[in-house]
Amino acid sequence: MATANFGKIQIGIYVEIKRSDGRIHQAMVTSLNEDNESVTVEWIENGDTKGKEIDLESIFSLNPDLVPDEEIEPSPETPPPPASSAKVNKIVKNRRTVASIKNDPPPRDNRVVGSARARPSQFPEQSSSAQQNGSVSDISPVQAAKKEFGPPSRRKSNCVKEVEKLQEKREKRRLQQQELREKRAQDVDATNPNYEIMCMIRDFRGSLDYRPLTTADPIDEHRICVCVRKRPLNKKETQMKDLDVITIPSKDVVMVHEPKQKVDLTRYLENQTFRFDYAFDDSAPNEMVYRFTARPLVETIFERGMATCFAYGQTGSGKTHTMGGDFSGKNQDCSKGIYALAARDVFLMLKKPNYKKLELQVYATFFEIYSGKVFDLLNRKTKLRVLEDGKQQVQVVGLQEREVKCVEDVLKLIDIGNSCRTSGQTSANAHSSRSHAVFQIILRRKGKLHGKFSLIDLAGNERGADTSSADRQTRLEGAEINKSLLALKECIRALGRNKPHTPFRASKLTQVLRDSFIGENSRTCMIATISPGMASCENTLNTLRYANRVKEFGISPSDIPFSQGSGSRPDLSPSYEYDDFSPSVTRVKELTVDPTAAGDVRPIMHHPPNQIDDLETQWGVGSSPQRDDLKLLCEQNEEEVSPQLFTFHEAVSQMVEMEEQVVEDHRAVFQESIRWLEDEKALLEMTEEVDYDVDSYATQLEAILEQKIDILTELRDKVKSFRAALQEEEQASKQINPKRPRAL
């Protein structure tokens, strides 16, 4: 086989090649293939090295300057050309002769004339000469090469090459965008109105490097531990085609993809990032949540401490599931809740030698706080009174403590309490817990308190969304829930900062848990449960902001685990928008009262004279510790509590205090009425005697009637004032402004 003539082609030089899609670009020659007269070339495209095999004819057609030199000279086997051919060849070698034959003016540049003018005149002359001689094949080798490979082209300048590169990149980018649009069109779910948001969230998650919390991670010691738990989408949300807008990329980071819309109706995502001590995704079981949250607190109560663990979140976000146990339909498996898991570890700790010698006894209580009132769930929901003794210790009068010997006893008490807990229907849940349930495990040594573990399942944290136009009872539920949650937050903040005063009297919940917020050996854990659905996005953000206020964390871009290939943020197409991650997104401003802004705060705390002020004067309760703590609470949360909302809370607190006094006075009058009946019965029996003392009868009857009139008149006046307070509460509820948007 004859050896292929590669001309000026050498390994390592760059040649122009033509791709199958018509693109022309440079590539480096890597090998010369003599067996099939081809060359192998390679080039770099999108960071990848690509190559192909191209025949010599294609190479020479695009690179005529690489044509072999011997093809230009006449071959020895070729017979001498006729005269006409020789004349043509002579013209080719001496271009000026051609110009003089045509009698054209002498050109200034022979190359330009020869290439632009002489060449077109040669081929018709050659064609006519060949026809006259009767031979078409008698063509010079130079003309044969030109006919085969076309006229030689000039070398491209760097500017032209750069323009061609830009054009190539533009075409490539358009091709990629077209492929992306076609791919999106295939993925479009016409039945889902939020498929754009779904694609944005999916693409964003693809840029993250997931490092979720595992059981192998260490457990850190915290005096105040704040964690977040995400539940999976439920059946109702799945049927409604709701989207999961919560992402937990690492063990302490929670991201909320909040859908937004511009003025031009373009939809985009606003990503808000929060950091906590722990973050549990929707695959974490109750046992794992308990391991990092409540389990470290069990040892605290054996060391004469007070421990508190509470679940906080929107209705239906999984609070009762976390604290009470797994649900199977309407049935609850109490053995898998934090209540039972904590009790199990308590009994295991009792068997340890260093605690066994203490001879500790375990007791349990279970009560609920509903609309500011306390009810014993283990004693047929008996209403209880919360009082302070002379040592300023809070006592829940009448609360039953039941001794428990094993975990089974605890499970029975939990079943009894859950069966009679107050619930109601809200927009988020058909069976919603509307009360705070408090389950306490108490250790006593020889009758004296040794330690207490309070496990609280809080009511839903909806800020009046379901109570704006409801009846009084539901309205009071929402008011008490919101007030108690604000008070709980401030009490925990005071515990973490060792503040001298804790506003625990602002609500019944914090008043009952007072001993858990005071003392150096007090520890608290908060489990914020969140719903993943897009429909619950606002309530989810409220929950996360509340948790962030309890224990303020900072967040930086380095805390977000982006994958290595994506850099600090993913590549975004023009239809995507993501906010930069900055600490200002999630750092919630600490609310303190600025002394220089007292004029701004004064209208919130002082109101024009109204019926409440008149009632304060009459009842003498205007400066009670409860109302002082309520004022302090509202001052510390002035951005969340508007003047109208404070007036409403003030009216509700006043009404609740008056209600308790009216009921207490009514009970006292009833007991006194029994004594009056006995006295009146004795007087009537005296009149049946023949010679009874009429003066004594009249005197005693008059005394009884005067006493009755005085007591009943006082009770009637209080009832009238109580009715006025009810009207004042109703008027205040109508003046509450909608919740102001939070500026981050």
From Swiss-Prot:
Q: Which residues does the annotated region (Disordered) include?
A: 66-186
Q: Which UniProt keywords apply?
A: Acetylation, ATP-binding, Cell cycle, Cell division, Coiled coil, Cytoplasm, Cytoskeleton, Developmental protein, Differentiation, Microtubule, Mitosis, Motor protein, Neurogenesis, Nucleotide-binding, Phosphoprotein
MF-aspect GO terms: ATP binding; microtubule binding; microtubule motor activity
Which part of the chain is the Kinesin motor domain? 223-553
Q: Where is the composition biased (Polar residues)?
A: 123-140
Q: Where on this chain does ATP bind?
A: 313-320
Looking at the record's lineage, which domain of life comes first?
A: Eukaryota
Residues annotated with Phosphoserine modification: 75, 100, 135, 140
Mark the residues carrying the PTM Phosphothreonine.
Answer: 78, 97
Pfam families, sorted: KIF2A-like_1st (PF22923), Kinesin (PF00225)
One GO biological-process annotation of the entry reads: microtubule depolymerization
Coiled-coil portions? 154-187, 698-737
Quaternary context = Interacts with AURKA and PLK1. Interacts with PSRC1. Interacts with MCRS1; the interaction enhances recruitment of KIF2A to the minus ends of spindle microtubules which promotes chromosome alignment.
* Task of the protein: Plus end-directed microtubule-dependent motor required for normal brain development. May regulate microtubule dynamics during axonal growth. Required for normal progression through mitosis. Required for normal congress of chromosomes at the metaphase plate. Required for normal spindle dynamics during mitosis. Promotes spindle turnover. Implicated in formation of bipolar mitotic spindles. Has microtubule depolymerization activity.
What this protein is called in its record is Kinesin-like protein KIF2A
Q: Which organism is it from?
A: Pongo abelii (Sumatran orangutan)
